[in-house]
Curated annotation (Swiss-Prot):
One of its GO terms (molecular function) is guanylate kinase activity. Its EC number is 2.7.4.8. The keyword ATP-binding applies. This is Guanylate kinase. It is found in: Cytoplasm. Keywords: ATP-binding, Cytoplasm, Kinase, Nucleotide-binding, Transferase. Essential for recycling GMP and indirectly, cGMP.
Length: 227
């Protein structure tokens, strides 16, 4: 196989929006254990990169720029938005939040998987632009368990917990939009299921083609509808 054919296979893969890396979107109501599971997954799988959002809000105590968020000004955020640099963005309580499209595409093109901790509205925006993005919804084993977890965190007043539980009901209604659902009854089992989802996604035809385009073309295998 010539170098030009190899380059052509890889170029066609990228042109078709199929990257060597995968994009995972993890959605869950507050208290379902999303962040704990995501952090554990990231520590076990060095090939996954966590997307860090841009925000115009001020850093909270202990937060570091580039680790928790990319903290920026309203002017800079609006300029980036005008340049279509964000995959999805929203205004929350007077502050802007956005997910960098440029960074995500760069990571996926070099073969890294990218994970987004995101709400269901953001996931809908992402899915419209990345049809191969994989949605994973984390569910609690019951509403009673969710309430108990929120209380044990000790972070919120009772009225805030009540609001979170009400919000959880509307959020959970969007679980059907995800490709996978993980019920977080026990941490170990839920983490194992997340790892299985990642492994299965990496074996999808489009993922394998993007990672091994040279081999697929040599064997006469092409992307569906490819010319």
């Amino acid at each position: 196989m010539t170098d030009s054919n190899r380059d052509g296979a890889a170029a066609h893969s990228l042109h078709a929006g199929v990257y060597p890396g995968n994009l995972f979107m993890v959605v869950a109501p507050s208290g379902a254990g999303k962040s704990t599971l995501v952090n554990a997954l990231l520590s076990k799988d060095p090939e996954i990169r966590l997307s860090i959002s841009y925000t115009t809000r001020k850093p909270r105590p202990g937060e570091q720029d580039g680790q928790h968020y990319h903290f920026t000004t309203v002017e800079d955020f609006r300029e980036r938005h005008a340049r279509h640099e964000f995959l999805e963005s929203a205004e929350v309580h007077g502050n802007y939040y956005g997910t960098s499209r440029v960074w995500i595409e760069e990571q996926m093109k070099i073969g890294h998987d990218v994970l987004l901790e995101i709400d269901w509205q953001g996931a809908q925006q992402v899915k419209k632009q990345f049809r191969n993005a994989v949605g994973i919804f984390i569910l609690p084993p019951s509403l009673a368990a969710l309430e108990e977890r929120l209380k044990k965190r000790g972070q919120d007043e009772p009225n805030v917990i009540t609001r979170r539980l009400l919000a959880a009901g509307s959020e959970i209604a969007h679980a059907a939009e995800a490709q996978y659902v993980v019920i977080n009854e026990t941490f170990e089992h839920a983490l194992a299921e997340l790892e299985c989802i990642v492994a299965a996604t990496r074996l999808r035809f489009t993922s394998q083609y993007a990672r091994h385009a040279e081999l697929f073309v040599e064997l006469g295998i092409h992307l569906p509808h490819a010319e």
